[in-house]
């Protein structure tokens, strides 16, 4: 009885080798994700009038608002600045995640 042929396009890897490789990649991805969660990401709006700082797991760590950004006659402006700073911080997390984990997910979708 002959051995089963390797899967075409897999470089001659058998199923056990493929599983080992998949486990190794999974461990590397988990380490990359852990590295991201320990980093801090900052979004700033209007010359640092509002600064939002996040951890890599998307937790808001701090929100700094300069007193001059608080205008009782224009609360919408402050809302817009906070939204802008928060969105910029979250975008930084997304970009770092894509840069770090993108090398593992290329070609999967």
Curated annotation (Swiss-Prot):
It comes from the Bacteria. Homodimer. PANTHER family: NUCLEOID-ASSOCIATED PROTEIN YBAB. GO terms for cellular component: bacterial nucleoid; cytosol. It is found in: Cytoplasm, Nucleoid. Keywords: Cytoplasm, DNA-binding. The keyword Calcium does not apply. One of its GO terms (molecular function) is DNA binding. Pfam families: YbaB_DNA_bd. Residues 18-40 are annotated as: Disordered. Binds to DNA and alters its conformation. May be involved in regulation of gene expression, nucleoid organization and DNA protection. InterPro entries: YbaB-like_sf, YbaB/EbfC. Its main location: cytoplasm. This is Nucleoid-associated protein Ldb1634. Belongs to the YbaB/EbfC family.
